[in-house]
């Protein structure tokens, strides 16, 4: 965004310095992707920038690594990708349901101890991941779910629910509860009111939270 012409010099210096450092951080985060992506098309036995790749020779590029990941029988990448997608799918469903229900409860004006419950629900996001992971591992080992798909799904539900709670709660901030009371006065039951009125209105927050939970 351009600065007004009457902006003072010291503010201009600070503004452009700030933009420079923001660009530097952005470059630091994005640059590795521009290095890894070309390497994934390497035709050599080892992943590196070969002489043919640097010379832009078509023989230096190949889809062998993608083919090996998808169709390879001895490569564990295909199985790992499949397991990750399955776990992410079920964890997203669980996190979205729990997070949405929790956010609806927290949005009620009759809900006691809102701050305490909110802090408890988002604590997996605040606590360092190594601490959360260690605690979840020992708990899952105690109940016999360590190294199982069920245990991993439950663990990711715990870590993904806070994202849904935050996004749905933010959406419910501007929610007009008079529409639900109007639906109830016209004879609509709570389930029908939620499915036809509340859910469509908060759907952007639910979808955003689900996406965050999926990538978590």
Segments the model singles out, each with a brief description of its role:
Residues 30-34, 38-41, 93, 97-101, ...:
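Membrane-embedded alpha-helices of multi-pass transport/permease systems
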């Amino acid at each position: 965004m351009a600065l007004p012409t009457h902006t003072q010099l010291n503010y201009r210096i600070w503004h452009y310095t700030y933009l420079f450092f923001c660009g530097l951080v952005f470059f630091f985060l994005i640059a590795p992707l521009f290095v890894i992506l070309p390497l994934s098309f390497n035709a050599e036995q080892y992943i590196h920038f070969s002489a043919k790749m640097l010379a832009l020779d078509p023989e230096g590029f190949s889809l062998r690594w993608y083919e090996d990941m998808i169709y390879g029988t001895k490569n564990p990448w295909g199985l790992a990708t499949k397991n990750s997608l399955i776990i992410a799918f079920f964890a997203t469903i669980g996190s979205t349901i729990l997070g949405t229900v929790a956010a609806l409860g927290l949005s009620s004006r009759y809900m006691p101890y809102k701050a305490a419950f909110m802090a408890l629900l988002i604590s997996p996001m605040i606590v360092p991941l190594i601490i959360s992971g260690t605690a979840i591992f020992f708990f899952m080992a105690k109940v016999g779910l360590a190294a199982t798909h069920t245990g991993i799904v439950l663990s990711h539900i715990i870590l993904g629910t806070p994202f849904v709670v935050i996004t749905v709660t933010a959406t419910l901030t501007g929610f007009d509860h008079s529409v639900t009371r109007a639906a109830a006065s016209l004879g609509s039951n709570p389930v029908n009111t939620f499915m036809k009125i509340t859910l469509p209105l908060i759907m952007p927050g639910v979808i955003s939270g689900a996406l965050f939970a999926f990538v978590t």
